[in-house]
Amino acid sequence: MATVELGYDFTKTYTSLTPTPKDLDNTAPKLGTIFESTDGKAYRFVLNNHSSDLVIGDVVFLDKTASYPNAVSVLNTDSCGAVAAGVMAGAAMGAIPAAGYGWIQFAGVGSANWEGTTDIVLGDSLKGVNSQVYVVKDAALAATATYVNHMRALAAYTTNAAAVGTNNVAINCRVW
């Protein structure tokens, strides 16, 4: 089900910021548009500056190498540590095509992909992984976040399967 607030469908994606004559009433929001809801969730309209399509729940990083200030990518040179490198930006809200546009959630309770080869306890801090679309347990500190931009597990996960699954998280990726 689409998340719709005040006319925004956060699962809608666009291949261009320029409307076609058939699509004048469905123009893409301005790149960088931020929407904050009354329930603490926050969204940003971004460019997927990566060569692969994103799906709902994919974790993305701020692409500071891009010419656009609101571009995201799955690439991150140091797992969101250095300001000059990638910073975890949030989770994709829809299937954003490569070089396309769509919404990411950067704050509040949401869903994100996480990798489950390590037990995750409710409240554990989750950190991004370079060149991956998921978060993992921040094993060094468990409940204390290593990085300013992080996610927090809202469920326990003890399956220890290598597969990536989408689970509930508290997203805290406000620093850009």
Q: What name fits each language-model region?
A:
Residues 2-176:
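Glycine-anchored, exposed beta-strand/edge motif detector
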